[in-house]
Amino acid sequence: MIKLILTDLDGTFLDSKGSFDKEFYQQVKGSMDDQAIYFAPCTGKQCERVEELFGPELSKDLWILGDSATRIKHNNEYVYESLLPNDLGIKLINKLEEIANDYTIIACTPTAAMIKETTSEEDKQMVRGSYREVQLVEELNKITEDFVKITVYDRKKRCFEYVKELMEFKEQAYIVASEAAWIDISNAGVHKGTTVKELQKLLGVTKEETMAFGDGLNDIELLNAATYSFAMENAFEETKAAANFITRSNDEQGVLQKNKKITKKKKKN
């Protein structure tokens, strides 16, 4: 019996325009609620940005694994987080600034996602697509808080190459190029898979009672935490290989279509 359904957002739950059919979602979510199935977005987006995307009503009772699954938020309360120590975060920022000076570094703290004042307007808009709380700072290496995560956005799509230059930190932090334009860095041993396990403990749900959807390379650990693991038709081949099943693409509402079928089957049973 499925008790928990998790989904990545970009490229998975959201379509190519970054949106979803709210009416269809309400129908499917109603069926999930009737059957006491928990629903949890698991995403690189800031938790507050997820709440903004779903809106006040639709975000009620969501279990949000946000900020690259370094935090779990439920009904306005953080119930779990694992932070990257400030001193290590500053070393990583300094290294990233050495590697290149023409990409955007997003240094996320519990307060806000921080970017440099010199960030282009185009990249500022891109950042605001994933983060509601954003602050502009003169220098990222002057931040004094611990970090939720550090992210690189590279419009030139060189992240698969640049991530290799961070391997000196691989024992100290979890580092992944989720796709050619993105690198995500979080506390050591903290990724979507480990945070899903924290949520499963909180809810008393097993891997065998869990369903998950993903498309990116950073979703592989998420899929490994669920017996019913689905890669999207538009997923990376490595992600498809890690999944037990393949479903329709994000532009075909694959997540909602599959959830509709699953909840219908449960009603019949």
Predicted regions and their residues:
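Mg2+-dependent phosphoryl-transfer enzymes with acidic/Ser/Thr/Gly-rich catalytic loops
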Residues: 1-4, 21-22, 184-269
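Non-catalytic pre-domain segments flanking phosphatase-related domains
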Residues: 1-7, 26, 30
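Asp-based phosphoryl-transfer active-site loop
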Residues: 3-18
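Active-site metal-binding loops of divalent metal-dependent hydrolases
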Residues: 9, 45, 214-216
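Active-site phosphate-binding/coordination module
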Residues: 20-121
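Short active-site oxyanion
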Residues: 35-40, 60-62, 148-149, 208-210, ...
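Short, structured coil segments at secondary-structure junctions
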Residues: 58-60, 68, 169-171, 225-226, ...
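Conserved acidic, metal-coordinating active-site core of Asp-based
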Residues: 101-213, 217-221, 234
